Curated annotation (Swiss-Prot):
Enzyme Commission code: 1.5.1.5, 3.5.4.9
Protein name per UniProt: Bifunctional protein FolD
Catalyzed reactions per annotation: (6R)-5,10-methylene-5,6,7,8-tetrahydrofolate + NADP(+) = (6R)-5,10-methenyltetrahydrofolate + NADPH; (6R)-5,10-methenyltetrahydrofolate + H2O = (6R)-10-formyltetrahydrofolate + H(+)
Name of the coding gene: folD
Summary of subunit composition and partner proteins: Homodimer.
Biological process, per Gene Ontology: L-histidine biosynthetic process; methionine biosynthetic process; purine nucleotide biosynthetic process; tetrahydrofolate interconversion
NCBIfam families: PRK10792.1 (NF008058), PRK14186.1 (NF010783)
Residue sites binding NADP(+) per the record: G166, R167, S168, S191, I232
Gene source species: Synechococcus elongatus (strain ATCC 33912 / PCC 7942 / FACHB-805)
Family, per entry: Belongs to the tetrahydrofolate dehydrogenase/cyclohydrolase family.
InterPro entries: Aminoacid_DH-like_N_sf, NAD(P)-bd_dom_sf, THF_DH/CycHdrlase, THF_DH/CycHdrlase_cat_dom, THF_DH/CycHdrlase_CS, THF_DH/CycHdrlase_NAD-bd_dom
Superkingdom classification of source: Bacteria
Higher taxonomy: Bacteria, Bacillati, Cyanobacteriota, Cyanophyceae, Synechococcales
Annotated Gene Ontology cellular component terms: cytosol
Amino acid sequence: MAAAILDGRALAAQRRQQLREQVEAIAPAVGRRPGLAVIMVGDNPASAVYVRNKERACEQTGIVSFGKHLPGDSSEAEIRALIEELNQDDRVDGILVQLPLPSHLDAVPLLLAIDPEKDADGLHPLNLGRLLRGEEGLRSCTPAGVMELLAANQIDPAGKKAVVIGRSILVGKPLAMMLLEANATVTIAHSRTPNLPEVCRQADIVVAAVGRPELVGADWIKPGAVVVDVGINRLEDGRLVGDVDYEAASAITSWITPVPGGVGPMTVAMLLHNTVLSYCRRSGQPFLS
């Protein structure tokens, strides 16, 4: 039985439309549209593509994008000064620093410099702490996008065993907290986990987020499990693949995300969601989406 597809592109388009309708409804009362500032340092080609995609998504949603492109040799102090300027700019509701940064820069102090109420990526320690405590806050975009995909397809994690392969602060750790919040029994697996395939075979939900092309084969997956592939890897032949062997896994899973077109579009959708949420909070308007 072929797996059903967790279609991130279609759901992201639906979410963009919902956000656009909300923006159009409240912008006249606020006197402006929401604003998202994207800081890019250097000329990484992949980052440039991601930034263009975000700017295009902003346009489709009615969000004003403020592109801030700095030279690759910019200092931490120069970037912090820009972040502080954006923190004080009332036109800006969300700020993100496009990663990765040039090797001479440390992302952590720059992410700490962002106003937590404008933390569009949901990576500030205050927002991660709110997640840990089960409080409202701006949530990490990729994990939140995964949870949206599950919810939109009536996949309830409650009572299920979930294995998250990967322990990064970007995906693995916050996603484990979100699944736990949804009443799943969660295991975080990683490179030091003994018998990793066997651990995965116990799971009703498997999330792969390690950045290793097609690491997870069909023999790692329990028949009927839900598989979410967060990885995106470019092979030498130019193909984009995830961390899961899609063709093999899709023959035995109940649901699976494609790569591309699964989690990636939802990451951008949640970035827009966080920006509009911040806009509503800062302007005293109800958030409906």
